[in-house]
């Protein structure tokens, strides 16, 4: 990757992330090169293909790094973060509306432009179907996961 292609993040965001890693050491796993590349790709994709989107929900948000990267590219975007793990949600609540709930049980309270599911590899087909069938009609959706079966809690591949 040439220096001109390196994503640029502002100082406050980097400080926020490092505070997060100090408070939550497992947050460091959100910063593997493959994680950052997939998140910056997705944020660029949203900016290019859904420029009019105003409110999105990120399912499997974990510590909100994807939300932060999207916010860098689309500053007016309202982002709602959902994760079943309450520990990371406490961190994301510092910056975004956040809820600790299983994604297939989430209740939509108002319209959203798009939903993003970043943890499909952690869901059984039954859970995935329940989540997918709950998405309001006319809502864009993005699925992003991985095919790393070396992780014990990965039950499916994308």
Can you annotate each of these PLM segments?
Residues 1-51, 84-110:
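S-adenosyl-L-methionine
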Residues 51-54, 76, 111-112, 136-138:
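A general structural motif
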Residues 51-63:
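Conserved class I S-adenosyl-L-methionine
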Residues 63-74:
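Conserved SAM-binding loop of SAM-dependent methyltransferases across substrates and taxa
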Residues 78-83:
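Conserved SAM-binding motif I beta-strand of class I
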Residues 112-126:
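A short SAM/SAH-binding and catalytic strip from SAM-dependent methyltransferases
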Residues 124-158:
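C-terminal substrate-binding/active-site "lid" region of AdoMet-derived donor-dependent transferases
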């Amino acid at each position: 990757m040439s220096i001109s292609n390196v994503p640029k993040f502002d100082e406050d965001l980097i400080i926020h992330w490092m505070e997060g890693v100090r408070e939550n050491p497992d947050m460091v796993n959100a910063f593997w090169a493959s994680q950052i590349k997939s998140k910056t790709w997705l944020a660029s994709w949203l900016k290019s293909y859904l420029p009019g989107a105003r409110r999105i929900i990120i399912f499997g948000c974990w510590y909100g790094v994807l939300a932060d990267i999207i916010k860098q590219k689309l500053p007016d975007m309202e982002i709602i973060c959902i994760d079943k793990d309450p520990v990371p949600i406490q961190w994301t609540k510092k910056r975004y509306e956040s809820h600790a709930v299983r994604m297939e049980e989430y209740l939509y309270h108002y319209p959203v432009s798009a939903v993003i599911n970043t943890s499909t590899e952690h869901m059984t087909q039954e859970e995935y179907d329940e989540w997918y069938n709950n998405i309001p009609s006319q809502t864009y959706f993005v699925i992003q996961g991985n095919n790393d079966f070396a992780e014990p809690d990965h039950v499916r591949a994308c």
